Amino acid sequence: MAREFSLEKTRNIGIMAHIDAGKTTTTERILYYTGRIHKIGETHEGASQMDWMEQEQDRGITITSAATTAAWEGHRVNIIDTPGHVDFTVEVERSLRVLDGAVTVLDAQSGVEPQTETVWRQATTYGVPRIVFVNKMDKLGANFEYSVSTLHDRLQANAAPIQLPIGAEDEFEAIIDLVEMKCFKYTNDLGTEIEEIEIPEDHLDRAEEARASLIEAVAETSDELMEKYLGDEEISVSELKEAIRQATTNVEFYPVLCGTAFKNKGVQLMLDAVIDYLPSPLDVKPIIGHRASNPEEEVIAKADDSAEFAALAFKVMTDPYVGKLTFFRVYSGTMTSGSYVKNSTKGKRERVGRLLQMHANSRQEIDTVYSGDIAAAVGLKDTGTGDTLCGEKNDIILESMEFPEPVIHLSVEPKSKADQDKMTQALVKLQEEDPTFHAHTDEETGQVIIGGMGELHLDILVDRMKKEFNVECNVGAPMVSYRETFKSSAQVQGKFSRQSGGRGQYGDVHIEFTPNETGAGFEFENAIVGGVVPREYIPSVEAGLKDAMENGVLAGYPLIDVKAKLYDGSYHDVDSSEMAFKIAASLALKEAAKKCDPVILEPMMKVTIEMPEEYMGDIMGDVTSRRGRVDGMEPRGNAQVVNAYVPLSEMFGYATSLRSNTQGRGTYTMYFDHYAEVPKSIAEDIIKKNKGE
């Protein structure tokens, strides 16, 4: 089957937003106008096309990025719906990796909200071009100018409107296009009938002023345009469009549009802007990977059908009908269903059963995928999130995705024997889908422990076990992932010697332990001179230290951010062995625990709380009572925002407490920021508890 849409006419976009900015409704309307849906589903009734997992429908939030394909004005638009809740920022990061552009949706009353900032930062890290859609213009208190100002003040973004609304709240009735200086008026409720009219006289001055500001903002990124602008020359519509497109693609400028998805206004114009200003796979920098056989050698995956096949798996899902679905983005080359591919990340050969193009909750079988496409494959057994798929002769790895370690853990127990096996299967499948979710069995207690990125994250996973896998389980109290580290340096000896008839065991090491920089992890240095410890035993010393560090020295938590320098030791020709040196290294660590001033570290969360000013005193008091450190405050519209660092152990149940402190008017987001030392009195309690005292 030949290519249906050329690369120039392909757009891979994501829709990013704060939790209640109307992202899902916006996606819905895109699907409605591109002819993919016949009836519109409202999120607040729990029946949206993109939110296809039951939990999402219950909670009215979007959790998994479903990939949907739609067509508009002769172009293919692949939409990846990204989650808007901060516990799911890994999902967002993962989908940003495969996008070429994004639409950031703002609430016209609130402007840029805390979660918008988080997602915006991530998009900037990955260099994703964006356009901004100021949604909910029909809402009470909607203020377009204020929303645009928050882009400047809170995100320092070079953003300018390419549209202006006429009216707001109930009076919102038309949109002025500042590029072409036209006006569009909506004449029916479904927003399918649009009338192009002249810009009303009383709005002309405002429109001309806004157009001049737009040209000025774009001219900063284009020398040609700047010359014309300074020389008062006429700038044509096509020149302005091209300059906006260039600046947007280079992530130097962000066009701002307006509308209300719920009331069906402005969505088609936003789709036009996606086509006009967001890049095709040919316009963005080609992705650079490296050779599996030689990590130093860079390889470029060029958007070209005739190139070697290379794709990145960005999402794994379990579908009740077809089993495991692997969503992937093709960067170069083509692939047909039934063919074999290589998973270069894991070094395995995989057979692609069927290829599916996904609509939010229905699917269409296809024969071939081309570069720039996003599709799902059935039949890939070993491929996980972040793996590279490539042609059998190719051995490119498209930079591995690195995922943060879980910061919160819970114990889960099946309610009955029948649930036991089902729970094991469920946990395996959920870990395949979500690399930030970990499950293991505690060796000492035999309990199954699950770990994730926040309370909501784990709540939803437990909920999914119940709904999708019919597993009833009891959930224990949340546990924090503490760590341990050394605060001072020391030189210690670890000696293991055992004689019990026949061959003995002998290993002797002298190691200098010093604190490492925060976040630098464990570093091992071999400084042995003259072979006092033979070379073949050095890896055993390092392995022995790593094993011992896993169980810490104070309360059984992993020891992190430590340097170990092996500088002396001795061995025995007959009795020395790898095992003996492993044990000697662990004895050295025990010795270091007495001299290196070990401390317990706890995860500190960056918490952003937004609430009406009158609750400020209560909230500040509450943050302090949770051992929090306030890092700054700022007014945001008619609300106040408090930024603070608070230990995770003090944040359990915070949602309920914030609700009661602010009569339900406060919101907060939090994510892991760094590890910090635990106060002595609390550390003593943790040690006692872990020793069962």
UniProtKB/Swiss-Prot annotation:
It comes from Staphylococcus aureus. InterPro entries: EFG_II, EFG_III, EFG_III/V, EFG_IV, EFG_V, EFG_V-like, EFTu-like_2, G_TR_CS. It comes from the Bacteria. Has vitronectin-binding activity. Belongs to the TRAFAC class translation factor GTPase superfamily. Classic translation factor GTPase family. EF-G/EF-2 subfamily. This is Elongation factor G. GO terms for cellular component: cytoplasm. Residues 8-282 form the tr-type G domain. HAMAP family: EF_G_EF_2_B. Catalyzes the GTP-dependent ribosomal translocation step during translation elongation. During this step, the ribosome changes from the pre-translocational (PRE) to the post-translocational (POST) state as the newly formed A-site-bound peptidyl-tRNA and P-site-bound deacylated tRNA move to the P and E sites, respectively. Catalyzes the coordinated movement of the two tRNA molecules, the mRNA and conformational changes in the ribosome. It is found in: Cytoplasm. Its main location: cytoplasm. Keywords: Cytoplasm, Elongation factor, GTP-binding, Nucleotide-binding, Protein biosynthesis. GO terms for biological process: ribosome disassembly. Gene3D superfamilies: 3.30.230.10, 3.30.70.240, Elongation Factor G (Translational Gtpase), domain 3, P-loop containing nucleotide triphosphate hydrolases, Translation factors. One of its GO terms (molecular function) is GTP binding. The keyword Cytoplasm applies. The keyword Protein biosynthesis applies. GTP binds at residues 17-24, 81-85, 135-138. SMART domains: EFG_C (SM00838), EFG_IV (SM00889).
